[in-house]
Curated annotation (Swiss-Prot):
Protein name: Enoyl-[acyl-carrier-protein] reductase [NADH]
Metabolic or biological pathway: Lipid metabolism; fatty acid biosynthesis
Classification via NCBIfam families: EnoyACPredFabV, PRK13656.1
Catalytic activity: a 2,3-saturated acyl-[ACP] + NAD(+) = a (2E)-enoyl-[ACP] + NADH + H(+)
UniProt organism field: Shewanella oneidensis (strain ATCC 700550 / JCM 31522 / CIP 106686 / LMG 19005 / NCIMB 14063 / MR-1)
Source organism phylogeny: Bacteria, Pseudomonadati, Pseudomonadota, Gammaproteobacteria, Alteromonadales
Annotated positions binding substrate: 225
Any GO BP: fatty acid biosynthetic process
Amino acid sequence: MIIKPKIRGFICTTTHPVGCEANVQEQIALTKAKGKIANGPKKVLVVGSSSGYGLSSRIAAAFGSDAATIGVFFEKPGTEAKPGTAGWYNSAAFDKFAKAEGLYSKSINCDAFSHEAKQKVIELIKQDLGQVDMVVYSLASPVRKLPDSGELVRSALKPIGETYTATAVDTNKDCIIEATVEPATEQEIADTVTVMGGQDWELWINALAEAGVLSDNCKTVAYSYIGTELTWPIYWHGALGKAKMDLDRAAKALNDKLSVTGGSANVAVLKSVVTQASSAIPVMPLYIAMVFKKMRQEGLHEGCMEQIYRMFSERLFRADGAKPETDSDNRLRLDDWELREDIQQHCRDLWPQVTTENLSELTDYQEYKAEFIKLFGFGIEGINYDADVNPYVEFDVIEL
C-alpha cells in the first residue's frame, strides 16, 4: 500500500516502515561514527526499547559497545491492510541490523508492567545470557495495569494546586493559543505516581536480582526530565513531577541494594527532545521549538541518540573507569547544556513575544514539525513516499 501521514491530535495514526527503518539506520550510523564506548556494557536489558530514549539506549549498547540486547516493548504489528506502530518497525529494523552484525538481539512484545513479562525476561536471560550488566528503564505509558489486581490506572498531565494558563502552540493548526489546564485531584496525583513513578522499575530490578540474573557490577538507569521554571507548573511541579520524584526515591533504594556488590542505580535527567511522549505534554512543543533554535545556534543541539551516547561514554562508562559525576541527589545530569543560563534566559525573553505570525521565524517550529513526523517514518530524504510498501513486517519477536 501507499502510506501517507495522517495526524490526529498529537499522534500520527499512520507509519511508514521504510522511513522507520531509515531512522534506526541513521542512529546506528551516528553511533558508529562516534566510535566504540570503552568499558561499555556487554549484556543489556532495555525495558521500553522501541522508540525515543529507550531505542537510542539499545542502539548505543549494541552498536557502541557490541552488547547483546533484550528489548521489551508494547507495540502493534502491521497487517497487510494497515500499518503497525512506529515502535514495531523501529524494533524490526534494530533486530535486522543487529543480527546482520552478528549481535544477539531478542525482543518481547508485552505489557512490561506485568509479572509475566518479568518472568519471561528472566527465563530468556538464564537461557541465553546468564546475567545482564545493564538494565535501562525507559517506559513512557499513560496507563498501567496493576499486576496483582488487574486494575487499570491512568496518569494525568496536570498542574498541582492551581489552574495553569500559558502560551502554547496548537500543532494541528500551527497557531499560538492560550492553553489552560485544570489542576489534578489528589487521586490523579497518586495515580500518576503509580503509573509513571519508580514502583515498576523496583519490581523489575528486584525480580531480576532475586532470580540471580544481574551481574555484581550491574548498572541500572531510569530516565527523567526536570526542566526549568518555564515548564515546571505542568512538569516538575505538576503530577508528572511527583512521579519523577518517586523515581528518585526508587533510585536511592535500588542503589543501596546494588552498590553492595559493586552495581549502581541512577536516574538520568535528560534534555527535552521531540518524542511521542513529549508531544503530549501541554506547552512542551513550543518550549522545545524555542530551546532547539537557541541550542542549534550555540552548537549544543542533541537528539535522543547524541544524548544517550554522551550518557554512556561520558557518564556511566567512562574510558578512565572513573565514577560518573552526579548531582546532590545522585542523578546523572545530561540536561546540563539545555539548562545553561544564557539558553534559558533566551527562552524566558522570547516566550511572551511569540505570535502565530512570527512562530516559524523566532523558533524552530518547522523543524519541530519535521522531527515529529519523522518519528513515524515520514519526511525523510531519499524515500519515495509514492512507492508501494508492505506494512506487514515480521521479525524475531516473542509475543506474550
